[in-house]
Amino acid sequence: MSMQDPISDMITRIRNGQSAKKELISMPYSNLKKSIANLLKEEGFILDYKVEDNKKPTLKLNLKYFKNNPVIEKIKRISRPGLRIYKKRKHLPNVMSGMGIAIVSTSRGIMTDKLARTYNLGGEIICYVE
């Protein structure tokens, strides 16, 4: 069976890994997933990620915990294949009054809502991370 929405699969793997207190989770590799993992690392939501290139490339994420609680309290998919959500720069969401991030796919690549506002860009809202 083919995977219909790989980003939702990635988000679900992160959620399940954190609820099971896993330190390392793995998933099939794609450039989009790598970009999202890079943003999560830059914003301090995960410790690190690496790409293992065997027969099938794999993306491995090192999850981050603080006082035995996951750093990512909530991660939610917004735009999905059945219902794409696009926002202009003025209408980009402010997640948790700036404490969380929205990951946005823009014409300049994948970036946070804060960075998209500085570049005056809108785009597709991929997910919220709190």
Swiss-Prot record:
- Known PROSITE patterns for this protein? RIBOSOMAL_S8
Mention one GO molecular function. rRNA binding
SUPFAM superfamilies registered for this protein in UniProt:
Ribosomal protein S8 (SSF56047)
Q: Which InterPro entries match?
A: Ribosomal_uS8, Ribosomal_uS8_CS, Ribosomal_uS8_sf
Q: Does the keyword Ribosomal protein apply?
A: yes
Question: What does the record note on quaternary structure?
Answer: Part of the 30S ribosomal subunit. Contacts proteins S5 and S12.
Q: What family classification does the UniProt entry report for this protein?
A: Belongs to the universal ribosomal protein uS8 family.
Q: What is this protein called?
A: Small ribosomal subunit protein uS8
